Amino acid sequence: MRRIVLAVLLLAMVAGCEWPGDVAPLAPKKRPVAERPAVNLPLALRQSNWWGTGGQGSCTWATMVSLLRWQGRYRMADWVRQNCGDGEWPDDMAQRLDEAGVRYAYVTNGDVKFLEWACRTRRGCGITIRGGQHMVALVHLDEKWAALLDDNAVEQYIWVPRETLIAEWKASDGWAVTPIYAPAAPLPQ
């Protein structure tokens, strides 16, 4: 019995028991800062553009590969990288994604709510720019700013005013596409 009492006393001394009145009140926590950009894809997972077998750039597919990796679909991203290439149009890409069993959503009507949803849910989306001749990943969209990941220069994000980006996107066919899987968890605060 003495050993048990001695062990409990020893544990209490080591654990540092305090009375409820002795504990300092919790300091108010700062509001966590949202990760910027919302889709903060590590450099190693960003897919650069490549030349397809038809001699065209593969920006739509490179963007899809990056977004699939962000959403944890690495094998699917590798399959897309190995089996798809060249330029693509919305209906053709939809057909290929359907055949591959990829879950996705897209718009071709310039609906800004789709962009907001894709960024709010941290999925991001591919969007057309330059008159519909190029696709980049929209990785952030807030009240003032948009961030793009261009597969022709994956080293850094391109920040542009929101309204400038939306006007460019709408003038470029208003096509946006994203895979629909769970995105990566946010960085710890």
Model-derived features: positions:
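Positively charged n-region of N-terminal signal peptides that target proteins for export
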Residues: 1-4
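C-terminal motif of bacterial Sec signal peptides marking the signal peptidase cleavage site
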Residues: 14-16
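Conserved active-site-adjacent core of cysteine acyl-enzyme catalytic domains
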Residues: 18-43, 68-188
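A short glycine/serine-rich beta->alpha loop
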Residues: 44-54
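Short low-complexity stretches enriched in small and charged residues
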Residues: 54-60, 101-106
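Active-site alpha-helical elements of protease catalytic centers
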Residues: 57-70
